[in-house]
Amino acid sequence: MNRLVLFVVAMGICAAQGPKIFIVSDMEGVGGVNNADEQLLPGQRRYDESRRLLAGEVNAAVAGALEAGASLVVIWDGHDSSRSLSIDDIHPRAQLIQGSDTPPDYYLGEKLYDGIMFVGQHAMAGAKGVLSHSQSFSVQNIFLNGQPVGEIGQVAAIAGQFDIPVIMLSGDQAACDEVLTLQPKAETVAVKRLVGKTSTLSLSHAEARLQIQVAANRAVKRISEFKPWKLQTPVEMKIEYYPGAAGVLATTLNHGESKQVEPRTVVYRGRTVLEVYQHWLTP
């Protein structure tokens, strides 16, 4: 999800004809997905199964949002460089953003959204969740203004800069718990939970889709109740890498605005959270 900032920049004020919803999808939080060696990347034995399960959960969220009066639902495929969803698979009334190299100017245009939903979301690195990580399995911790965040918090902070709230999340139980620390009123659906070191207990796909559709419907109907999560400015982001991630760290240090403050720690600073992420993601 390294390019997530580019897909949340285009947030704005409420639409007149009905809420416009932006869905961030990922795969590690989908029900039934628990094996990084078999289910997460193209060519792996069960990857096609994971794609099918992801599409089902995403489409359930789309259906629920539309039933509640959403005028537009745009999905960003946030897994594996936007290669996990196909336009053949998504709800016919949804739109799909794909491609990690999409020009940033496209997302800095006039597209406006009223709420963000997460589908298939995992918890931050270090959390006791299913396949928990932050951007990559090389990152140990990420802090925004001293607060630990994962991908959920990063999206929430960027959206908050544009006064857009997170309204719903589906994923594993740890991800649901995480979003509620930032948005206590968010609708959540825990489609699975960790029951061992790597084993999970998941809802059936049919039940997961039903609960996601209901939650998305409720979230859109309640959209006026949600407040964005805002960071004080200026903003500092600190990234701590695991030992052995020297190659990733070296690549990060090629970014002109970074500062290495400890052997495994890099800091970025900016006037806004968006500026900080542009420093991080722009080589």
Residue ranges and their predicted role:
Residues 92-109:
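A glycine-rich helix N-cap at a beta->alpha junction
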Residues 24-25, 76-77, 116-120, 169-170, ...:
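Short beta-strand segments
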Residues 17-35:
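Mature N-terminal segment immediately following signal peptide/propeptide cleavage
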Residues 158-166, 170-217:
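Active-site rim beta-loop-alpha module in soluble metabolic enzymes
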Residues 41-76, 82, 93, 215-222, ...:
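Alpha/propeptide regions of enzymes that mature by internal proteolysis
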Residues 137-162, 171-174:
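Active-site glycine-rich loop that binds ribose-phosphate moieties when present
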Residues 73, 208-283:
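C-terminal accessory domains and tails appended to enzymatic cores
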Residues 3-13:
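Sec-dependent N-terminal signal peptides
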